[in-house]
Amino acid sequence: MHRSKRLFAVALIAASCVTQVRAADWGLKPGKVELKSAGALAFGPDGILFVGDSTAGAIYAIDTGNTKGAASAAPLNVAGLSAKLAQLLGVAEADVKVNDLAVKPESGQVYLSIKAGNPPQAALVSISADGTLAKVSLDNVPHQRAELADAPDSAVGRRGDPRDDAVTDLAYREGKLLVAGLAKGESPSTVREFAFPFADAATATNIEIFHAAHGRVEDGAVVRAFVPLVIDGEPVLLAGFTCTPLVRFPIKALEPGSKVRGTTVAELGNRNRPIDMVVYEKDGARYVLMANSARGVMKISLDKVGENPGLTEPVKGGGTAGQPFETIAELPGVEHLALCDDAHAIILARSEGGSLDLRTIDLP
């Protein structure tokens, strides 16, 4: 064998061994992952990707391998992404739906959760730093699975199937995976906590909010997007709901079997659904950047958000109140966003012609 080929083979074997050891450290074992659906995504330690599978009522932790590179490398831009996804997956472009995206901190690779085809199938797709797309093989990958013991039963109703919202968003924080979604019971809106590696069953907390646009307290409104952060020294969840209250929850209050009412720090307008949220700092101030279904991309100030006493009166007529924000007119059509580094984000945006494009942007 040529010396360069031998060295390459040795390098591949070494990389494989490192991956196997790293995966074993987190309790991951090789095997086939059979996704019934692929929804919310979040990265944890050592390039481990968490995938919410609402249909199966489960969370997967999947080793994605390569951890070399940097999220702050050259900007990643892929025009006509929807057409390229369709070609990669062998389906019509109209039958491709991106459910979420996440940026791998160690390498800068972008991962997408996909619903593709008719009937639809779940898939994961990675995009490398040079823009190359690849379907993530799940045939024999180190992974671990955690069950949602209290996932809602499937039942199609006026507001859709609650099972589809068993997992709506994920975030990894200090050895725990936080999972928002719906559960069985009379107070279905829930935040679950899984210790990772997965061992024990999740702890679950029912949550309720004052929904200013509706003028009432609700415990059935599901969290659509959230971010964990520290405000005035206290770890909190900042969560966005449909129609569009922004609510603060102290993480220390999320106790098993309890019911916690959050503080509604903003009402951002009705007939809208938050899609993704990221927290960043610019010019010494902190902000949330939030993509929405109908109200564009919002830059929300976190100034004095810890002191905000919360809204207690109705906000009618599609109005707004609470934390100040601005809508970023330069970012139309954004369907998903994720933080890339301290100064940049990755967005998926729909062009006027209907194409879905991936772009790297400066944080506004």
Task: Identify the role of each PLM range.
Residues 9-17:
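Bacterial N-terminal signal peptides
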